[in-house]
Protein backbone atom coordinates (compact mmCIF):
# COMPACT_ATOMS: atom_id res chain seq x y z
CA UNK A 1 0.00 0.00 0.00
CA UNK A 2 1.35 3.42 -0.94
CA UNK A 3 1.75 6.12 1.67
CA UNK A 4 -0.89 8.87 1.89
CA UNK A 5 0.19 12.35 2.96
CA UNK A 6 -1.95 13.70 5.78
CA UNK A 7 -3.16 16.68 3.76
CA UNK A 8 -4.80 14.16 1.40
CA UNK A 9 -6.56 12.20 4.16
CA UNK A 10 -9.89 14.14 3.94
CA UNK A 11 -10.31 12.69 0.44
CA UNK A 12 -10.08 9.15 1.84
CA UNK A 13 -13.07 9.01 4.24
CA UNK A 14 -14.27 5.42 4.47
CA UNK A 15 -11.07 4.05 2.94
CA UNK A 16 -8.21 2.11 4.49
CA UNK A 17 -4.90 3.92 3.96
CA UNK A 18 -1.33 4.09 5.26
CA UNK A 19 0.15 7.20 6.91
CA UNK A 20 3.61 7.84 8.35
CA UNK A 21 5.14 10.48 10.57
CA UNK A 22 6.28 11.67 13.99
CA UNK A 23 4.17 11.36 17.12
CA UNK A 24 3.50 14.94 18.15
CA UNK A 25 1.25 14.11 21.09
CA UNK A 26 0.36 10.89 22.88
CA UNK A 27 -2.33 10.20 25.47
CA UNK A 28 -2.39 6.61 26.62
CA UNK A 29 -5.03 5.66 29.19
CA UNK A 30 -6.34 2.29 30.36
CA UNK A 31 -9.15 2.08 27.83
CA UNK A 32 -8.16 4.50 25.05
CA UNK A 33 -5.11 5.85 23.26
CA UNK A 34 -4.98 9.05 21.22
CA UNK A 35 -2.03 9.73 18.96
CA UNK A 36 -1.51 12.97 17.05
CA UNK A 37 0.56 12.01 14.04
CA UNK A 38 2.40 14.71 12.11
CA UNK A 39 4.01 14.70 8.69
CA UNK A 40 5.27 17.66 6.66
CA UNK A 41 1.78 18.31 5.27
CA UNK A 42 -0.40 18.20 8.39
CA UNK A 43 -1.66 16.36 11.47
CA UNK A 44 -4.04 13.46 12.02
CA UNK A 45 -5.60 11.98 15.15
CA UNK A 46 -5.22 8.22 15.53
CA UNK A 47 -7.84 6.85 17.94
CA UNK A 48 -7.55 3.40 19.51
CA UNK A 49 -10.20 1.72 21.67
CA UNK A 50 -8.07 -0.93 23.34
CA UNK A 51 -10.94 -3.35 23.89
CA UNK A 52 -11.53 -3.44 20.15
CA UNK A 53 -7.83 -3.74 19.27
CA UNK A 54 -6.02 -5.74 21.99
CA UNK A 55 -3.33 -6.68 19.45
CA UNK A 56 -2.16 -3.02 19.36
CA UNK A 57 -1.82 -2.50 23.12
CA UNK A 58 1.77 -3.75 23.49
CA UNK A 59 2.90 -1.56 20.60
CA UNK A 60 1.12 1.52 21.95
CA UNK A 61 2.68 1.04 25.38
CA UNK A 62 6.14 1.27 23.78
CA UNK A 63 5.45 4.59 22.04
CA UNK A 64 7.01 7.89 23.10
CA UNK A 65 6.59 11.47 21.84
CA UNK A 66 8.60 12.13 18.65
CA UNK A 67 8.81 8.44 17.78
CA UNK A 68 8.26 7.63 14.11
CA UNK A 69 5.49 5.20 13.19
CA UNK A 70 3.61 3.81 10.21
CA UNK A 71 -0.13 3.43 10.72
CA UNK A 72 -2.59 1.56 8.55
CA UNK A 73 -6.27 2.07 9.22
CA UNK A 74 -9.67 3.38 8.20
CA UNK A 75 -10.44 7.09 7.90
CA UNK A 76 -13.72 8.10 9.55
CA UNK A 77 -15.56 11.31 10.29
CA UNK A 78 -15.93 12.46 13.90
CA UNK A 79 -17.33 15.91 14.62
CA UNK A 80 -15.69 15.92 18.06
CA UNK A 81 -12.18 15.77 16.63
CA UNK A 82 -10.64 19.24 16.40
CA UNK A 83 -8.36 18.43 13.48
CA UNK A 84 -10.89 18.77 10.68
CA UNK A 85 -13.47 16.39 12.13
CA UNK A 86 -11.52 13.38 10.85
CA UNK A 87 -9.67 10.57 12.60
CA UNK A 88 -8.13 7.22 11.76
CA UNK A 89 -9.08 3.92 13.40
CA UNK A 90 -5.91 1.82 13.05
CA UNK A 91 -5.66 -1.83 12.23
CA UNK A 92 -1.87 -1.87 12.33
CA UNK A 93 0.83 0.29 13.96
CA UNK A 94 4.46 -0.30 13.05
CA UNK A 95 7.25 1.35 15.01
CA UNK A 96 9.95 2.76 12.72
CA UNK A 97 12.01 4.52 15.40
CA UNK A 98 11.60 5.07 19.15
CA UNK A 99 12.59 8.51 20.48
CA UNK A 100 14.40 8.93 23.78
CA UNK A 101 13.30 11.70 26.17
CA UNK A 102 13.98 14.98 24.38
CA UNK A 103 17.01 17.00 25.57
CA UNK A 104 15.34 20.37 24.86
CA UNK A 105 12.00 22.07 25.44
CA UNK A 106 10.77 23.43 22.12
CA UNK A 107 7.80 25.36 23.46
CA UNK A 108 7.02 26.88 26.83
CA UNK A 109 4.70 24.63 28.86
CA UNK A 110 2.14 26.51 30.94
CA UNK A 111 1.66 25.69 34.61
CA UNK A 112 -1.23 23.50 35.74
CA UNK A 113 -2.65 22.75 39.18
CA UNK A 114 -0.32 19.77 39.45
CA UNK A 115 2.76 20.91 37.51
CA UNK A 116 4.97 23.98 37.35
CA UNK A 117 5.53 25.88 34.13
CA UNK A 118 8.44 24.71 31.99
CA UNK A 119 10.46 27.36 30.17
CA UNK A 120 11.44 27.00 26.55
CA UNK A 121 15.10 26.11 26.02
CA UNK A 122 17.38 28.94 24.90
CA UNK A 123 18.07 29.43 21.20
CA UNK A 124 21.64 28.15 21.65
CA UNK A 125 20.40 25.00 23.38
CA UNK A 126 17.88 24.48 20.62
CA UNK A 127 20.55 24.90 17.94
CA UNK A 128 22.57 22.17 19.69
CA UNK A 129 19.64 19.88 18.81
CA UNK A 130 18.45 21.76 15.75
CA UNK A 131 17.02 18.69 14.01
CA UNK A 132 14.61 18.25 16.92
CA UNK A 133 13.75 21.94 17.09
CA UNK A 134 13.01 22.01 13.36
CA UNK A 135 10.07 19.63 13.83
CA UNK A 136 7.88 22.43 15.23
CA UNK A 137 5.01 23.92 13.24
CA UNK A 138 6.69 27.33 13.31
CA UNK A 139 10.00 26.15 11.90
CA UNK A 140 8.46 24.03 9.19
CA UNK A 141 6.15 26.87 8.17
CA UNK A 142 9.11 29.24 8.07
CA UNK A 143 11.00 27.08 5.59
CA UNK A 144 7.92 26.43 3.49
CA UNK A 145 7.44 30.19 3.25
CA UNK A 146 11.11 30.69 2.43
CA UNK A 147 10.90 28.08 -0.31
CA UNK A 148 7.80 29.78 -1.70
CA UNK A 149 9.49 33.20 -1.60
CA UNK A 150 12.62 32.03 -3.42
CA UNK A 151 10.67 29.98 -5.95
CA UNK A 152 8.43 32.95 -6.78
CA UNK A 153 11.46 35.20 -7.30
CA UNK A 154 13.17 32.56 -9.42
CA UNK A 155 10.03 32.20 -11.57
CA UNK A 156 9.77 35.99 -11.90
CA UNK A 157 13.30 36.15 -13.31
CA UNK A 158 13.05 33.08 -15.54
CA UNK A 159 9.90 34.55 -17.06
CA UNK A 160 11.99 37.63 -17.96
CA UNK A 161 14.75 35.70 -19.74
CA UNK A 162 17.21 35.57 -16.84
CA UNK A 163 19.69 32.68 -16.79
CA UNK A 164 20.52 30.94 -13.52
CA UNK A 165 24.27 30.44 -13.01
CA UNK A 166 26.44 28.96 -10.25
CA UNK A 167 29.71 30.73 -9.53
CA UNK A 168 32.82 29.52 -7.66
CA UNK A 169 32.92 29.80 -3.90
CA UNK A 170 36.70 29.31 -3.78
CA UNK A 171 38.24 32.51 -5.11
CA UNK A 172 41.72 33.99 -5.52
CA UNK A 173 40.93 37.49 -4.22
CA UNK A 174 38.36 39.01 -1.88
CA UNK A 175 35.34 40.43 -3.68
CA UNK A 176 34.51 43.02 -1.02
CA UNK A 177 36.85 43.82 1.88
CA UNK A 178 39.91 41.71 2.56
CA UNK A 179 39.40 41.89 6.32
CA UNK A 180 36.11 40.00 6.11
CA UNK A 181 37.15 36.87 4.23
CA UNK A 182 37.94 33.35 5.37
CA UNK A 183 41.37 32.28 4.14
CA UNK A 184 41.81 28.61 3.25
CA UNK A 185 44.78 26.54 2.11
CA UNK A 186 44.52 25.78 -1.59
CA UNK A 187 47.34 23.39 -2.42
CA UNK A 188 50.46 25.62 -2.67
CA UNK A 189 48.69 28.98 -2.23
CA UNK A 190 45.94 30.81 -0.41
CA UNK A 191 42.32 30.96 -1.48
CA UNK A 192 39.29 32.66 0.04
CA UNK A 193 35.67 31.74 0.58
CA UNK A 194 33.47 33.99 -1.54
CA UNK A 195 31.68 36.84 0.24
CA UNK A 196 29.47 37.35 -2.80
CA UNK A 197 29.35 36.36 -6.48
CA UNK A 198 30.01 39.97 -7.47
CA UNK A 199 33.02 39.51 -9.73
CA UNK A 200 31.55 36.53 -11.52
CA UNK A 201 28.13 38.12 -11.98
CA UNK A 202 29.93 40.89 -13.83
CA UNK A 203 31.99 38.38 -15.78
CA UNK A 204 28.68 37.00 -17.04
CA UNK A 205 27.78 40.50 -18.27
CA UNK A 206 31.11 40.72 -20.10
CA UNK A 207 30.31 37.30 -21.58
CA UNK A 208 27.09 38.65 -23.09
CA UNK A 209 24.69 36.68 -20.87
CA UNK A 210 22.78 39.95 -20.31
CA UNK A 211 20.54 38.71 -17.47
CA UNK A 212 21.66 36.30 -14.75
CA UNK A 213 20.85 35.33 -11.19
CA UNK A 214 22.23 32.95 -8.60
CA UNK A 215 21.25 31.43 -5.28
CA UNK A 216 24.00 29.97 -3.15
CA UNK A 217 26.09 30.07 0.04
CA UNK A 218 28.40 32.96 0.89
CA UNK A 219 30.75 33.70 3.75
CA UNK A 220 31.68 36.73 5.87
CA UNK A 221 34.45 36.60 8.47
CA UNK A 222 32.78 39.20 10.67
CA UNK A 223 33.00 38.78 14.45
CA UNK A 224 29.51 40.13 14.82
CA UNK A 225 27.10 39.01 17.52
CA UNK A 226 23.95 40.85 16.44
CA UNK A 227 20.58 39.26 15.76
CA UNK A 228 20.96 39.80 11.99
CA UNK A 229 24.52 38.69 11.12
CA UNK A 230 25.97 35.25 10.43
CA UNK A 231 29.24 34.03 8.98
CA UNK A 232 27.60 31.81 6.36
CA UNK A 233 24.38 32.75 4.62
CA UNK A 234 22.30 32.02 1.54
CA UNK A 235 22.33 34.74 -1.10
CA UNK A 236 20.02 35.63 -3.96
CA UNK A 237 21.96 37.74 -6.46
CA UNK A 238 21.23 39.10 -9.89
CA UNK A 239 22.86 41.25 -12.55
CA UNK A 240 21.55 42.54 -15.86
CA UNK A 241 22.85 44.56 -18.81
CA UNK A 242 21.86 47.56 -20.88
CA UNK A 243 20.49 49.63 -18.03
CA UNK A 244 20.36 53.42 -18.23
CA UNK A 245 20.81 54.08 -14.50
CA UNK A 246 20.67 52.44 -11.08
CA UNK A 247 16.97 53.34 -11.03
CA UNK A 248 16.43 50.45 -13.44
CA UNK A 249 17.98 48.16 -10.84
CA UNK A 250 15.73 49.53 -8.11
CA UNK A 251 12.66 48.99 -10.29
CA UNK A 252 13.66 45.39 -10.97
CA UNK A 253 14.18 44.71 -7.27
CA UNK A 254 10.90 46.18 -6.09
CA UNK A 255 8.99 44.19 -8.69
CA UNK A 256 10.90 41.03 -7.74
CA UNK A 257 10.18 41.40 -4.02
CA UNK A 258 6.56 42.26 -4.64
CA UNK A 259 6.14 39.06 -6.67
CA UNK A 260 7.77 37.04 -3.89
CA UNK A 261 5.66 38.53 -1.11
CA UNK A 262 2.47 38.15 -3.14
CA UNK A 263 3.15 34.43 -3.52
CA UNK A 264 3.94 34.00 0.18
CA UNK A 265 0.83 35.89 1.26
CA UNK A 266 -1.42 33.78 -0.97
CA UNK A 267 0.09 30.48 0.16
CA UNK A 268 0.99 31.08 3.82
CA UNK A 269 -0.15 34.55 4.90
CA UNK A 270 -2.84 33.33 7.29
CA UNK A 271 -0.55 30.75 8.88
CA UNK A 272 2.28 33.27 9.33
CA UNK A 273 -0.16 35.64 11.03
CA UNK A 274 -1.41 32.83 13.29
CA UNK A 275 1.95 31.34 14.30
CA UNK A 276 4.27 34.35 14.17
CA UNK A 277 1.89 37.28 14.61
CA UNK A 278 3.33 38.88 11.47
CA UNK A 279 1.21 40.39 8.70
CA UNK A 280 2.53 39.61 5.23
CA UNK A 281 2.05 42.89 3.37
CA UNK A 282 2.34 43.00 -0.41
CA UNK A 283 3.96 46.41 -0.97
CA UNK A 284 2.79 49.03 -3.41
CA UNK A 285 5.25 50.12 -6.09
CA UNK A 286 7.25 52.21 -6.60
CA UNK A 287 8.97 52.02 -3.22
CA UNK A 288 9.78 55.31 -1.46
CA UNK A 289 13.24 56.75 -2.21
CA UNK A 290 15.26 59.19 -0.08
CA UNK A 291 18.78 60.57 -0.25
CA UNK A 292 20.92 59.66 2.75
CA UNK A 293 21.46 63.30 3.72
CA UNK A 294 17.72 63.99 3.59
CA UNK A 295 17.01 60.95 5.74
CA UNK A 296 19.44 62.15 8.41
CA UNK A 297 17.78 65.56 8.30
CA UNK A 298 14.35 63.95 8.75
CA UNK A 299 15.53 61.74 11.61
CA UNK A 300 16.96 64.75 13.41
CA UNK A 301 13.76 66.77 12.99
CA UNK A 302 11.41 63.99 14.08
CA UNK A 303 13.42 61.86 16.51
CA UNK A 304 16.22 64.19 17.61
CA UNK A 305 18.72 61.72 16.19
CA UNK A 306 22.06 63.21 15.15
CA UNK A 307 25.43 61.84 14.07
CA UNK A 308 28.85 63.37 13.57
CA UNK A 309 29.61 64.75 10.12
CA UNK A 310 32.21 62.02 9.73
CA UNK A 311 29.48 59.37 9.95
CA UNK A 312 26.98 60.91 7.54
CA UNK A 313 28.41 59.22 4.47
CA UNK A 314 26.99 55.87 5.58
CA UNK A 315 23.90 54.59 7.38
CA UNK A 316 24.34 53.93 11.10
CA UNK A 317 22.63 51.00 12.77
CA UNK A 318 20.35 53.31 14.75
CA UNK A 319 19.44 55.33 11.65
CA UNK A 320 18.65 52.05 9.90
CA UNK A 321 16.25 51.15 12.70
CA UNK A 322 14.63 54.61 12.85
CA UNK A 323 14.18 54.69 9.08
CA UNK A 324 11.32 52.22 9.48
CA UNK A 325 9.42 54.61 11.75
CA UNK A 326 10.15 57.43 9.35
CA UNK A 327 8.97 55.63 6.19
CA UNK A 328 5.83 54.32 7.92
CA UNK A 329 4.90 57.83 8.98
CA UNK A 330 5.58 59.55 5.66
CA UNK A 331 4.69 56.84 3.15
CA UNK A 332 2.80 54.13 5.07
CA UNK A 333 5.31 51.69 3.61
CA UNK A 334 7.64 48.96 4.92
CA UNK A 335 10.38 49.45 2.32
CA UNK A 336 12.75 52.37 1.78
CA UNK A 337 15.42 52.93 -0.88
CA UNK A 338 18.30 55.12 0.37
CA UNK A 339 20.65 56.69 -2.19
CA UNK A 340 23.64 59.05 -2.42
CA UNK A 341 26.12 57.42 -0.09
CA UNK A 342 29.72 58.56 0.22
CA UNK A 343 32.11 57.04 -2.31
CA UNK A 344 34.41 56.17 0.60
CA UNK A 345 31.71 53.84 1.95
CA UNK A 346 30.85 52.13 -1.33
CA UNK A 347 32.67 49.44 -3.29
CA UNK A 348 35.15 50.57 -5.94
CA UNK A 349 33.10 48.99 -8.74
CA UNK A 350 30.06 51.23 -8.18
CA UNK A 351 29.66 53.78 -10.96
CA UNK A 352 29.92 57.42 -9.86
CA UNK A 353 28.31 60.49 -11.39
CA UNK A 354 30.13 63.66 -12.43
CA UNK A 355 30.13 64.78 -8.78
CA UNK A 356 31.63 61.54 -7.53
CA UNK A 357 28.38 60.26 -6.01
CA UNK A 358 28.00 56.45 -6.22
CA UNK A 359 25.13 55.38 -8.43
CA UNK A 360 23.64 52.89 -6.04
CA UNK A 361 21.40 52.36 -3.07
CA UNK A 362 20.56 50.37 0.03
CA UNK A 363 17.11 48.87 0.48
CA UNK A 364 15.70 48.78 4.01
CA UNK A 365 12.80 46.51 4.99
CA UNK A 366 11.22 46.87 8.42
CA UNK A 367 14.24 48.80 9.65
CA UNK A 368 16.89 46.33 8.46
CA UNK A 369 19.11 46.59 5.39
CA UNK A 370 18.42 43.74 2.97
CA UNK A 371 20.22 44.92 -0.17
CA UNK A 372 23.04 46.97 -1.58
CA UNK A 373 22.53 47.55 -5.29
CA UNK A 374 24.14 49.74 -7.94
CA UNK A 375 24.97 50.47 -11.50
CA UNK A 376 28.46 49.06 -12.00
CA UNK A 377 31.38 50.85 -13.57
CA UNK A 378 31.92 49.03 -16.87
CA UNK A 379 34.51 51.38 -18.44
CA UNK A 380 37.93 49.82 -17.98
CA UNK A 381 40.03 52.94 -17.42
CA UNK A 382 37.56 54.47 -14.97
CA UNK A 383 37.17 51.20 -13.06
CA UNK A 384 40.93 50.70 -12.87
CA UNK A 385 41.37 54.21 -11.46
CA UNK A 386 38.70 53.60 -8.80
CA UNK A 387 40.37 50.34 -7.81
CA UNK A 388 43.72 52.13 -7.56
CA UNK A 389 42.17 54.77 -5.28
CA UNK A 390 41.30 52.03 -2.81
CA UNK A 391 44.64 50.27 -3.21
CA UNK A 392 43.07 47.19 -4.79
CA UNK A 393 44.18 47.32 -8.43
CA UNK A 394 46.82 44.59 -8.12
CA UNK A 395 44.59 42.28 -6.04
CA UNK A 396 41.73 42.46 -8.55
CA UNK A 397 43.80 42.44 -11.73
CA UNK A 398 42.01 39.35 -13.06
CA UNK A 399 38.65 41.06 -12.46
CA UNK A 400 39.68 44.23 -14.27
CA UNK A 401 40.48 42.15 -17.35
CA UNK A 402 36.76 41.39 -17.71
CA UNK A 403 36.32 44.97 -18.91
CA UNK A 404 39.22 45.26 -21.37
CA UNK A 405 37.49 43.49 -24.22
CA UNK A 406 34.05 45.08 -24.32
CA UNK A 407 31.36 45.10 -21.65
CA UNK A 408 27.82 46.54 -21.69
CA UNK A 409 26.50 48.92 -19.02
CA UNK A 410 24.99 46.86 -16.23
CA UNK A 411 23.90 46.74 -12.62
CA UNK A 412 22.54 44.43 -9.98
CA UNK A 413 22.06 43.63 -6.33
CA UNK A 414 22.19 40.86 -3.78
CA UNK A 415 19.64 39.74 -1.19
CA UNK A 416 20.18 37.62 1.91
CA UNK A 417 17.59 34.84 1.84
CA UNK A 418 17.98 34.18 5.56
CA UNK A 419 17.55 37.85 6.42
CA UNK A 420 14.41 38.01 4.26
CA UNK A 421 13.07 35.00 6.16
CA UNK A 422 13.98 36.56 9.50
CA UNK A 423 12.08 39.76 8.72
CA UNK A 424 9.14 37.94 7.16
CA UNK A 425 8.54 35.96 10.36
CA UNK A 426 9.77 38.49 12.93
CA UNK A 427 12.66 36.35 14.20
CA UNK A 428 16.40 36.57 14.82
CA UNK A 429 18.90 35.27 12.30
CA UNK A 430 19.66 32.30 14.57
CA UNK A 431 16.04 31.20 14.32
CA UNK A 432 15.76 31.90 10.59
CA UNK A 433 18.71 29.86 9.30
CA UNK A 434 18.52 26.11 8.85
CA UNK A 435 21.79 25.85 10.78
CA UNK A 436 23.25 29.09 12.10
CA UNK A 437 26.93 29.82 11.72
CA UNK A 438 28.57 32.53 13.82
CA UNK A 439 31.91 33.30 15.49
CA UNK A 440 31.12 30.81 18.27
CA UNK A 441 29.01 28.32 16.33
CA UNK A 442 30.39 25.68 13.96
CA UNK A 443 28.28 22.66 14.98
CA UNK A 444 26.13 20.70 14.50
Language-model segments: which ranges?
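Short, highly charged C-terminal tails/helix-capping segments
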Residues: 271-285
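Flexible helix-coil linker/hinge segments at domain or subdomain boundaries
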Residues: 259-273
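Juxtamembrane/interface motifs at transmembrane-helix termini
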Residues: 108-110, 269-271, 419
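A translation/RNA-centric and nucleic-acid-associated enzymatic feature enriched
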Residues: 180-262, 285-444
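Cytochrome P450 heme-thiolate monooxygenase catalytic core
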Residues: 164-166, 272-276, 338
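Class II aminoacyl-tRNA synthetase-like tRNA-binding/catalytic domains
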Residues: 2-243, 435
